[in-house]
């Protein structure tokens, strides 16, 4: 009966479950990692979940070295793994192959897009959806059917090392981009797995530490993106976080996984742990006597699959010792089987090498990566230095090791394929490719700062900041680095006689700017940097984040004015670490906000970003029709270049008998406007924009007064509108 394709996924899953032995059920909840580099494949292919063995590298046992994984290699590896899993399963049930994919599939030659924090800077929902669509297509093409993405944790303390994986500090951005990603994955037959449910960091930005979030904070802030990913994005899996909330580890939190996720939101997929998260219930949180009990405790509270390795013996022991019932086991197995039928894995589990090679990193994908990189770059400061002109700037000194490294970021979260792509360029290579025939571009060595800075028309410094999981920061200044002599092609010279300058990057920037005021700093980083020590010394600052494989070209072309920057900050940049946590949507204070020596204002506010052109917003008005609210108007490009502006709508509520954030982003629109052109715009706000939890935690449209602000950043207001709600009716 389970082979009958005319039946629903639920019906087929129930029929198959009824035929399965206890052992086979246990294996469907077991998992295994990629093959080891020892030459022996110790994986058990009866397990229902396998990490993609087409991971970003592979070991050549004859040559004894690592090689990049080609698309053809990826398909062959996954085909073999799926084939073996079918052969070794009594009912021919294939394993689900999963992988990471925050900004590209994490293997071989997959397209490498900007990191999520950079994508968020675009304020472009459609772009993010298209990026996810490409990632989904590339994953599906090689046989990866589940991605551990997107991250929809809200980062409100930039000391957290995983800020780069997020869409920033704002609830609406995380909701919209999370939904866009989930739709892009799921529409291609790839399971989206929003993570990490929930919070994922504690006080001081410390990863995986206990969360002190109240039920109000959880519902108003941290639940929201997950809820929308489930209800609107169609996510069919969820990954739990390592941390605890109110002392209960999220991996075994029945309130989160059953009461909220399943009963309240209607989630019908399966829940997976963050890697070794179930073991952490015992080893880390110490709330059970052993791992076996931790596994059972998690499953009884709504958890399904432990990743990346889960021994069937652990589940078997839990059953034999009475920690776990077969009824609970069946519930989890059913959830997994239902998704395998829905994906079509039970009927057609294999993929085509030819299709994969046509799909992965094709011209359209690379063009999208280029567009994404351009939209993600933010111009923070410009005293008129940018854009540079080859008519005036004839000689440029480039400094910083990062200038000749592909700006993709180095952590687990996305592809390393860009490292092997012959047509991807570092910023230095791109500068020389596109402008080397007009401008002399010199890659400055460690002992040439004074000489080159004095004799060049401009200088560019690329910062070196390595961030990611396990790299939480106690400070947010540029880290000290060792600048080594390099050949002109960027390769390190290892001669011991060469000078190494252990230099503070801040001091280096100041030194360059001292000799050449036409200094541009390009930030290559994953979270905000304290610029107070050098900002006043330089002529321009570009926040580039980690812009992906096409980021080098995008940076070079921005510096020379091929297009106007349009990125906006998805996260607040503080003046110093002493202000943290600092975010715009804070609640008002009883006596003020800030320290004696600091008024609490940021260095750069949320939503901020400069342009090479100028815009004028005119005739803006509030439109209320049948209970729906929109801000309408027209925007004119009155500058000298084509460009794009991101208009933002914030609300501030008062008189509702509960303290609410001073401002909340409720709508935005990225608008392309050609030079001299006038474009009409409408930014709609849904009714839920005016909902909030009252003192009794009732979520509704309560009587209240609001100020709606049309703005280009949270601090740059174009026009305010007043609105009142009485008896759930909106009135101007």
Task: Tell me the role of every PLM-derived stretch.
Residues 1-696, 700-716, 731-732:
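Glycoside hydrolase catalytic-domain context in secreted enzymes
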Residues 717-721:
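Extracellular and select intracellular beta-sandwich modules with Ser/Thr-enriched
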Residues 723-730:
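Short beta-strand edge segments in extracellular beta-sheet folds
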């Amino acid at each position: 009966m389970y082979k009958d394709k005319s039946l629903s996924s639920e019906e087929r899953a129930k029929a198959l479950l009824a035929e399965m032995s206890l052992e086979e059920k246990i294996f469907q909840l077991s998992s295994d990692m990629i093959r080891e580099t020892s030459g022996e494949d110790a994986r058990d292919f009866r397990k229902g979940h396998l990490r993609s063995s087409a991971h970003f590298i592979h070991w050549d046992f004859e040559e004894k070295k690592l090689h990049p994984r080609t698309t053809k290699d990826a398909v062959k590896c996954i085909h073999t793994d799926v084939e073996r899993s079918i052969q070794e399963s009594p009912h021919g049930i294939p394993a689900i192959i999963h992988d990471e994919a925050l900004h590209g599939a994490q293997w071989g030659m997959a397209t490498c897009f900007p990191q999520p924090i950079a994508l968020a800077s675009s304020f472009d929902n459609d772009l993010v959806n298209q990026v996810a669509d490409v990632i989904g297509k590339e994953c599906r093409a090689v046989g990866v059917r589940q991605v551990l993405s997107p991250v929809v944790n809200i980062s409100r303390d930039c000391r957290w090392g995983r800020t780069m994986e997020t869409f920033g500090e704002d609830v609406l951005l995380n909701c919209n981009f999370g939904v866009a990603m989930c739709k892009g994955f799921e529409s291609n037959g790839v399971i989206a797995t929003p993570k990490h449910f929930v919070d994922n960091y504690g006080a001081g930005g410390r990863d995986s530490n206990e969360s002190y979030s109240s039920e109000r904070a959880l519902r108003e802030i941290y639940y929201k993106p997950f809820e929308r990913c489930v209800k609107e994005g169609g996510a069919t899996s969820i990954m739990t976080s390592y941390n605890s909330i109110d002392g209960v580890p999220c991996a075994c939190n029945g309130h989160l996984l059953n009461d909220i996720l399943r009963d309240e939101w209607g989630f019908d997929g399966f829940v997976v742990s963050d890697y070794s998260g179930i073991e952490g219930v015992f080893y880390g949180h110490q709330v059970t006597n052993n791992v076996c009990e931790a596994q059972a405790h998690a499953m009884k509270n709504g958890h399904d699959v432990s990743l990346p390795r889960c021994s069937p013996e652990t589940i078997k022991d839990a059953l034999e010792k009475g920690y776990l019932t077969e009824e609970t086991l069946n519930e989890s197995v059913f959830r997994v089987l239902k998704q395998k039928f829905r994906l079509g894995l039970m009927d057609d589990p294999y993929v085509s090498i030819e299709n994969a090679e046509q799909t992965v990193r094709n011209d359209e994908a690379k063009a999208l990566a280029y567009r994404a990189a351009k939209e993600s770059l933010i111009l923070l400061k410009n005293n008129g230095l940018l854009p540079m002109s080859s008519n005036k700037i004839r000689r440029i000194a480039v400094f910083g090791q990062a200038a000749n490294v592909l700006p993709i970021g180095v952590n687990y979260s996305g592809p390393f394929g860009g490292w092997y792509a012959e047509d991807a360029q570092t910023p230095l290579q791109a500068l020389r490719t596109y402008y080397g025939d007009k401008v002399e571009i010199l890659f400055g060595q460690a002992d040439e700062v004074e000489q080159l800075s004095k004799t060049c028309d401009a200088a560019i410094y690329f910062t070196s900041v390595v961030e990611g999981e396990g790299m939480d920061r106690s400070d947010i200044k540029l880290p000290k680095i060792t600048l080594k002599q390099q050949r002109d092609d960027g390769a390190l010279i290892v001669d011991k006689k060469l000078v190494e300058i252990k230099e503070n990057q801040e001091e280096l920037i100041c030194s360059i700017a001292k000799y050449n005021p036409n200094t541009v700093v390009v930030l290559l980083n994953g979270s905000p940097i304290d610029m107070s020590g050098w900002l006043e010394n330089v002529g321009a600052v570009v926040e580039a984040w980690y812009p992906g494989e096409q980021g080098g070209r995008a940076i070079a072309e921005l510096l020379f004015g091929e297009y106007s920057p349009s990125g906006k900050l998805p996260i607040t940049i503080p003046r110093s670490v002493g202000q943290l946590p600092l975010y715009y949507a804070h609640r008002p204070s009883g006596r003020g906000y800030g320290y004696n020596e600091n008024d609490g204002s940021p260095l750069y506010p949320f939503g901020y970003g400069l342009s090479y052109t100028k815009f004028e917003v005119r005739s803006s008005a509030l439109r209320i029709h049948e209970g729906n609210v929109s801000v309408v108007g027209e925007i004119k490009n009155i500058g000298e270049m084509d460009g794009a502006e991101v208009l933002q709508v914030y609300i501030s509520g008062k008189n509702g008998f509960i303290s609410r954030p001073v401002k909340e982003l409720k709508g935005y629109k990225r608008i392309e406007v050609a030079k001299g052109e006038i474009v009409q715009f409408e930014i709609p706000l849904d009714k839920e924009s005016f909902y909030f939890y009252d003192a009794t935690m009732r979520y509704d449209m309560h009587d209240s007064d609001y100020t709606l602000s049309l703005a280009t950043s949270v601090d740059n207001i174009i026009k305010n509108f007043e609105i009142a709600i009485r008896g759930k009716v909106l009135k101007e």
